[in-house]
Amino acid sequence: MRIKIIYKKLGREQAHGIAESDGIIYLDPRLKGKKHFEILIHEALHLINPTDSELAIIKKSITLTKVLWSEGYRRVDDTNDEPLQDGSI
């Protein structure tokens, strides 16, 4: 399954994230840090386990977030298309 992440403000939907059955996950760009990580995992689990209840998804996403966060997993911006001060990439 291919999953595509789209960042979109979700205030009207009153949600941090939304998973659609076509493999698209919408995440609110205002999410940061651990909460962003939790919601990304949560929405991915909806796509991977579509028959799971919301409560089961919540429990799994919280557990995975806590385990991976405690192991040091973080979001890192690794884009390198902006040259450094000396002009190198």
Predicted features and spans:
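Metalloprotease/metallohydrolase-associated module, dominated by Zn2+-dependent proteases
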Residues: 1-35, 50-89
